[in-house]
C-alpha cells in the first residue's frame, strides 16, 4: 500500500468513528432517581458512592455509636459495596476542634471502627475496609460553632 491509500483509510476510519452514535454504557447498577440525578458518573467510582449512596455518617458530641440516620447511609454503602466487589474503601474518622489531639485521634478511630463494624455486620468483607483517624486535623466545615462542629463529627468512606 502506498501512503495515499493508508492516509485515505485512516481518514475513513476517523470519519466513521466521528459519525457513530454515543450510547451510554448500561450496567444495570443504577436505577431510578439516582440514574437521572447523576449522569456521567462512572459506576463503582468514589463520585458514584458520594453522589448516589452517601459517603459520610455523623456522630453526636463525644460519641462513636452509629445513629439511625447513619445506619441508613451505611446500609446503602453495604449494598453498593455488594454490587462492586472489586472496590476497597477507607473509612476516616473525624472530630470537631474541641478536645486534645490525642483524645480526638482516639475518638475518630472509634468512629471509623464503628462504621467499619457496621458494614462488616452487613456482609462486607473486613479485608476490603481500612480505617484511619484524622482527629480534628481535617475539618469538613470551618468555624467554631455548633453547626460546624456537627459537620466535623463524622466518618467518611472513600474508595481506595
What are these regions (language model features)?
Residues 20-88:
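Periplasmic peptidoglycan-binding/tethering modules of Gram-negative envelope proteins
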Residues 3, 64-65, 102-103:
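Short, contiguous strand/loop micro-motifs
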Residues 1, 75-76, 143:
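A generic local structural motif
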Residues 1-7:
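Bacterial N-terminal signal peptides that target proteins for export
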Residues 94-160:
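Periplasmic OmpA-like peptidoglycan-binding domain that tethers envelope proteins to the cell wall
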Residues 7-13:
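Sec-dependent N-terminal signal peptides
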Residues 15-18:
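C-terminal motif of bacterial Sec signal peptides marking the signal peptidase cleavage site
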Amino acid at each position: 500500500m502506498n501512503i495515499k491509500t493508508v492516509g485515505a483509510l485512516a481518514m475513513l476510519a476517523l470519519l466513521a468513528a466521528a459519525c457513530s452514535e454515543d450510547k451510554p454504557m448500561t450496567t444495570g447498577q443504577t436505577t431510578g432517581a439516582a440514574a437521572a440525578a447523576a449522569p456521567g458518573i462512572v459506576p463503582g467510582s468514589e463520585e458514584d458512592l458520594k453522589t448516589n449512596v452517601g459517603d459520610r455518617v455523623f456522630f453526636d458530641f463525644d460519641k462513636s455509636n452509629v445513629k439511625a440516620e447513619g445506619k441508613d447511609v451505611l446500609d446503602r454503602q453495604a449494598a453498593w459495596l455488594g454490587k462492586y466487589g472489586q472496590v476497597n474503601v477507607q473509612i476516616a474518622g473525624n472530630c470537631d476542634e474541641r478536645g486534645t489531639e490525642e483524645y480526638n485521634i482516639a475518638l475518630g478511630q472509634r468512629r471509623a471502627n464503628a462504621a467499619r463494624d457496621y458494614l462488616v455486620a452487613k456482609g462486607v468483607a473486613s479485608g476490603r475496609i481500612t480505617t484511619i483517624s484524622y482527629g480534628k486535623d481535617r475539618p469538613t466545615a470551618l468555624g467554631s460553632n455548633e453547626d460546624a462542629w456537627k459537620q466535623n463529627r463524622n466518618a467518611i468512606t472513600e474508595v481506595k
